[in-house]
Amino acid sequence: MTSIAAPQPGLLRQYLVLTKPRVTQLAVFCAVIGMFLAVPGLPDLKRVLFGTIGIWLLAAAAFAINCLIEQEIDARMTRTARRGTARGTISPAQVLSLSGLLGGAGMLVLYHLVNPLTMWLTFATFVGYAVIYTVILKPRTPQNIVIGGLSGAMPPALGWASVANAVPAEAWVLVLIIFIWTPPHFWALALYRTEDYRKAGLPMLPITHGSKHTRLQIMLYSFALFAVTLLPYFMHMNGLLYLLAAVILGGIFVAHALRLYRSYSDERSRRLFRYSILYLALLFGALLVDHWVGVLSA
């Protein structure tokens, strides 16, 4: 009988890998930014704490389920072949137990210590990623990351709901930013990992439509992202400090995309992918800093 009780130290690390901690950290960071932007002053710290814990637990559960569903795909890809699910060192029953424990705990925390709205929105995000994206979209359409990107874009709305028990237009603007950011971020990865995805049999855009078309889409999305990131300023959510950061960070993003479009190399694609992660973290950091500058100077 399989159990996740008292695992070996090496197994603990394998469990952690299944939760994709780096991706989870960025998602939770964006959720926390949403929490602090939801109110003019300091948010209820109890809701911030338990909202963060609950969202992290459900995100980790969703990623673990993703690894279970994609274990055969992961085994064919160099980037993911070392995951415990791909190597067979962690059984499906163990992953289901882990995900059930994390997800169940997360839902209880959000429902009882935050609010039901956040719990249901986070659960819907879990289903959107673990089922709709992983099972239905990813293996069937090159637009998988576009359509399925909504679930990955939800953290700011989840954070906002944690504190305000509502999801107003301002929260959806933050969701829109991540939604538009997602395709160029993942397509940059898919470009320099094309053969990996081909071996896995996944219909990623560089495989179905070629490198040139993918690079064109990345460039177009980078322009759209630049425009969308100006919305917080024009909607009076943030001030000039944020606007300056958005223009500089967005300009660098567009420059990377233009260079990649004009002349492809794996290194240029890799640089864009890495910068896109830094970009999102810095952009959301600028949202928070500008917000607090406004609060303190009011």
UniProtKB/Swiss-Prot annotation:
Superkingdom of the source species: Bacteria
Gene3D superfamilies: UbiA prenyltransferase
InterPro entries according to UniProt: Protohaem_IX_farnesylTrfase, UbiA_prenyltransferase, UbiA_prenylTrfase_CS, UbiA_sf
Chief location category: membrane
Isomerase recorded as keyword: no
Membrane topology, as annotated: Multi-pass membrane protein
Record keywords, A-Z: Cell inner membrane, Cell membrane, Heme biosynthesis, Membrane, Transferase, Transmembrane, Transmembrane helix
Catalytic activity: heme b + (2E,6E)-farnesyl diphosphate + H2O = Fe(II)-heme o + diphosphate
Disulfide bonds: none
GO biological process: heme O biosynthetic process
Residues annotated as transmembrane: 23-43, 49-69, 95-115, 117-137, 144-164, 171-191, 234-254, 276-296
Record keyword Cell inner membrane present: yes
Gene Ontology MF terms in the entry: protoheme IX farnesyltransferase activity
Compartment(s) where it occurs, according to its Swiss-Prot or TrEMBL record: Cell inner membrane
Pathway membership, UniProt: Porphyrin-containing compound metabolism; heme O biosynthesis; heme O from protoheme: step 1/1
EC identifiers of the protein: 2.5.1.141
Reported function: Converts heme B (protoheme IX) to heme O by substitution of the vinyl group on carbon 2 of heme B porphyrin ring with a hydroxyethyl farnesyl side group.
Protein family per UniProt: Belongs to the UbiA prenyltransferase family. Protoheme IX farnesyltransferase subfamily.
Family annotation (PANTHER family): 4-HYDROXYBENZOATE SOLANESYLTRANSFERASE (PTHR43448:SF7), PROTOHEME IX FARNESYLTRANSFERASE, MITOCHONDRIAL (PTHR43448)
This protein's name: Protoheme IX farnesyltransferase
Species whose genome carries this gene: Bordetella avium (strain 197N)
Lineage: Bacteria, Pseudomonadati, Pseudomonadota, Betaproteobacteria, Burkholderiales
Gene: ctaB
